[in-house]
Amino acid sequence: MARQPPPPWVHAAFLLCLLSLGGAIEIPMDPSIQNELTQPPTITKQSAKDHIVDPRDNILIECEAKGNPAPSFHWTRNSRFFNIAKDPRVSMRRRSGTLVIDFRSGGRPEEYEGEYQCFARNKFGTALSNRIRLQVSKSPLWPKENLDPVVVQEGAPLTLQCNPPPGLPSPVIFWMSSSMEPITQDKRVSQGHNGDLYFSNVMLQDMQTDYSCNARFHFTHTIQQKNPFTLKVLTTRGVAERTPSFMYPQGTASSQMVLRGMDLLLECIASGVPTPDIAWYKKGGDLPSDKAKFENFNKALRITNVSEEDSGEYFCLASNKMGSIRHTISVRVKAAPYWLDEPKNLILAPGEDGRLVCRANGNPKPTVQWMVNGEPLQSAPPNPNREVAGDTIIFRDTQISSRAVYQCNTSNEHGYLLANAFVSVLDVPPRMLSPRNQLIRVILYNRTRLDCPFFGSPIPTLRWFKNGQGSNLDGGNYHVYENGSLEIKMIRKEDQGIYTCVATNILGKAENQVRLEVKDPTRIYRMPEDQVARRGTTVQLECRVKHDPSLKLTVSWLKDDEPLYIGNRMKKEDDSLTIFGVAERDQGSYTCVASTELDQDLAKAYLTVLADQATPTNRLAALPKGRPDRPRDLELTDLAERSVRLTWIPGDANNSPITDYVVQFEEDQFQPGVWHDHSKYPGSVNSAVLRLSPYVNYQFRVIAINEVGSSHPSLPSERYRTSGAPPESNPGDVKGEGTRKNNMEITWTPMNATSAFGPNLRYIVKWRRRETREAWNNVTVWGSRYVVGQTPVYVPYEIRVQAENDFGKGPEPESVIGYSGEDYPRAAPTEVKVRVMNSTAISLQWNRVYSDTVQGQLREYRAYYWRESSLLKNLWVSQKRQQASFPGDRLRGVVSRLFPYSNYKLEMVVVNGRGDGPRSETKEFTTPEGVPSAPRRFRVRQPNLETINLEWDHPEHPNGIMIGYTLKYVAFNGTKVGKQIVENFSPNQTKFTVQRTDPVSRYRFTLSARTQVGSGEAVTEESPAPPNEATPTAAPPTLPPTTVGATGAVSSTDATAIAATTEATTVPIIPTVAPTTIATTTTVATTTTTTAAATTTTESPPTTTSGTKIHESAPDEQSIWNVTVLPNSKWANITWKHNFGPGTDFVVEYIDSNHTKKTVPVKAQAQPIQLTDLYPGMTYTLRVYSRDNEGISSTVITFMTSTAYTNNQADIATQGWFIGLMCAIALLVLILLIVCFIKRSRGGKYPVREKKDVPLGPEDPKEEDGSFDYSDEDNKPLQGSQTSLDGTIKQQESDDSLVDYGEGGEGQFNEDGSFIGQYTVKKDKEETEGNESSEATSPVNAIYSLA
């Protein structure tokens, strides 16, 4: 027959029946034992110490107690016996000490005010309640008063005083207008904690309403209103601005006292124009961020749950643009008594020893007073078995007569604590608390525990026997726990039998028997296998099981981890599952579960269903797919203590099958409104059993997922709250670290809603010093930190943090090692030795400090060093201190990156978590001469085709005595490289002119500075490309990448670019010609870092590019790359790439040649941007960085705005083709002048037409009667110039202007009458009119006119 589970009371008895620390006995919760055993009284319920009642209701003063026999009750009022029988209005409830004062028949509640105390008594002692102070709530009326209008100057401060009537409890104050509208408050107008209304400065709009102070009384639910204030504001032409001044509190300093555990409220209200801002600070530390909050527009600082470490000086700073003032508030934290060790009930057996401990703390230190049965201990009869030692009472060899109730009253000026603890002496023979002759069945090879709860006084000893014989079972495969349970670590067949537990004390013994049966395990020996089947076929899944024949076997099947519904198409047998006519919905995982009442085994297989080959293509596949619709109609069923079934109706899949469902939950205690993932289920289910945590008010929703995406969440389900339980885990990440030298802050990660398991989650914090193994200190904390004060410096502690709620405590936590606070080290490294290794590095060696002087964890040795001066005269150096760290307990190290040729000083310290220790003796050393840095601003200019001008500046860091410069240069043309030439210059020379030997080639220059040690870092530049280097082509400008080296060299951007790295890598020429209207672009490959570019980049020589682009690969981390600049003469377009999120803002920073820096903020998605108001021909450096993090920046690039012609072109006046053209024109003009001069001096004959009607042709030969004196060759240039310049005028296209004239001696006219007229006698005016029409058509005249 199967063993029935024991009733719940057995588990309770099992947990509570045994002894606790110090040999004390806990009485089990078994009602029969509770009713049988005698017990002194214990107060179980009482009213609050300050008990305020509503005068309209009856007065109720609670007092309830338990004990055996049941206690009787009586009261004192104002320390005198209160005779209830004499007052008809006062009665006491039956079986209770609660007082009821009834005023239905009249009477005034005020007559019963006073201090009450309840006494609960039986024959074994008397328990006391707290002293309950009864007060009747009061809501007095406002005194009548006439308020004159308040006249105030505009901009002046103003305080409207409320002065509410004193109420009990104090009323809530608020201000209203005459129209019953709340007064709008802001940082200018606000209500103080005292109820007054403060105006930092009055404005005209303030007199548009009246101001009335209102007091709301809590108990009577009444509101009293003060007569309203009327404001009259006097206006002025201009409100003068004023520095702030404090309206409350007055002066520059004040003090405030607060009790531990209460809220501290500090307030500062200031006046001024404009309205001041208020800021709060704490002297010597930060405000406690976890419990400090600002109120009333930063005018009030509230610190909740004040502790001793919150004492100190706080100050508020009021400031506006006219100035600032501050007020210091000295805060003192006092404390009413609070428990360190509250006395607990003590149950002993006759002759046993025990103790009551009453330990409390407070400020000032509280006093402890012991009482017994309500009387001072000094007045009680002497007891030789009792000894009082301050806060402890020690009992030795207790007897039955020692039973009593002890009271511990600890008090100081701020309050008191009263605790009752009884001492009960019991002599009870052993008793068994579990049913007799239980049957326990277990599975072979498992672990099991046999329980035998018992009770007795004195505490019995328990032993186990098997089959009524043999020795006590303990050791080997058996283990007996302190509570008496017997554990069998691995069950074997031979362990089957009858086990007897025997409990014994001096009063007798009791025994019980447990019968143990061992069963074979359930095993699946033939498991179902994964299968692939076509739709419409039959599938069989096997599941063959072996089990104990005495146990009933049940075989069930799950599909996708949910119970499988066996329909008409399925057949379930003992060893298989058959599916007929397989369909797509049958696809999924199948689980065979073989179970008995003791154990189970399971096996899984996956069924894949393929579509039939003859099945036509799904016509839905062509339809557009979308995210599924939200699930709907969520329903909770099968409500259990730790689980619930959630069912939903799927939404439309929108042509894409639903693959998964995600169930989310929300709880309304810890994170209301925040949804968390609970579990995930296949898309084929629409119901799931959800495992729940205790004491969570759940609400669920479901999200469907397909290949397109997730649906909108479903509407939430109804809420379901689970019952509570003790926590099953403890908080994690427990740490102990000091924040000051004399404390240790214990912190942990608080538990969330699903691990709290009950209301009022709190944490029991325990600690003790690791070395001393002293008793544990403990405190209960509601937050996630606790500060242990008055600790030695850097001492290890054992720390435990245990979760607890109203249902009980969590499991016993493991200890964590923490350390108290560190103090500054007390010693410095000694015997510091410095050895100069080279011009930039030294080695250090020192002796370690003693460990006891570190006063903390030794983090590192640190060297502070600074450059005192340079050995070069008149060279200013920065004396900024630098540091080098040497982590761990080391004795030597190296300091590098020093400046050569300099005097240095060095000190060493030891560093712990607190900071630096004292400095060692200062050591001085000198670094030898080194090589200089690169020359600055190396510039290459080409004024003409014959020379190249070089200019540079001295190195920024000479690093020694400069002896000169070395210039190396070489000519190159494509892949051809000439011979390298080396020039040496004096240290004062900063210019050099190179005479070009080849006007076609370009030059590469490398310049470095020298000291006695050698040459320093070199800088490389190239001459611009000549303009005739390119071949005609319409291709856009293309440039190979150039790597920017440490010198900051940037490649040229001429029409034909030759890319050369700073390592002198030769790249083939790519000839291109760029149209003059298209800006060329230089591409520079570099690596983006998250720091600003090196200064050498910003000091790079200005390039002659029209546009600059930084081409880089996109890194994994957040970066900015591929910055592109397309400049014109007065503006430039900027673009870049980045991998920041959307909405990121950037800043473009650029600096011109005059070192003027400007920034342009760029809103998100605003690329490209345009920089305007630039100067033509000026060099700029530019970078782009993130507005949120300036450290994430692009590489610094350099560009130049364009001029009338680009700088890389030679001067046109020096070009050979231009000079040749000008010489040809000058020669032609000279020839024409000579011809004209000869003609003018000699004259000539011109051919005239032979017949009037025939015009003179340009190729006519000279006639016999009219010919030139020049030869035919002389006339050819004139004839040849008769044709128009464009070659389009034909012979017959010009009219002869002289065709109407006859022949005569004056006929010396050619077609240009104006020419002849200059050298012959003119005709009459009538004869010459009309001849001028041929003047413009004669090219000969044009040439002659040049003469």
From Swiss-Prot:
Pfam family for this entry, one: I-set
Keywords per UniProt: Cell adhesion, Cell junction, Cell membrane, Disease variant, Disulfide bond, Glycoprotein, Immunoglobulin domain, Membrane, Phosphoprotein, Repeat, Signal, Transmembrane, Transmembrane helix
Intervals, Extracellular compartment: 25-1217
Listed result of changing residue 1229 to E: In NEDCPMD; uncertain significance; decreased protein abundance in patient-derived cells; decreased cell surface localization
UniProt cross-references to Gene3D superfamilies, sorted A to Z: Immunoglobulins (2.60.40.10)
Every Fibronectin type-III domain range: 630-725, 730-823, 828-930, 934-1030, 1114-1206
Pro residues compositional bias, start-end: 1024-1040
Reported effect, residue 359 to P: In NEDCPMD; uncertain significance
Residues of this chain annotated as glycosylated in UniProt: 305, 409, 446, 483, 752, 778, 973, 988
Signal peptide from the UniProt entry: 1-24
Positions of region (Disordered): 713-740, 915-934, 1011-1040, 1090-1111, 1248-1347
GO molecular function, one term: cell-cell adhesion mediator activity
Polar residues biased stretches: 1278-1291
Disease as annotated in the protein's UniProt record: Neurodevelopmental disorder with central and peripheral motor dysfunction: An autosomal recessive neurodevelopmental disorder with early onset and a highly variable phenotype. Disease features include hypotonia apparent from birth, poor feeding, global developmental delay with absence of reaction to touch and no eye contact, infantile-onset progressive ataxia and demyelinating peripheral neuropathy.
Name assigned to this protein: Neurofascin
Organism: Homo sapiens (Human)
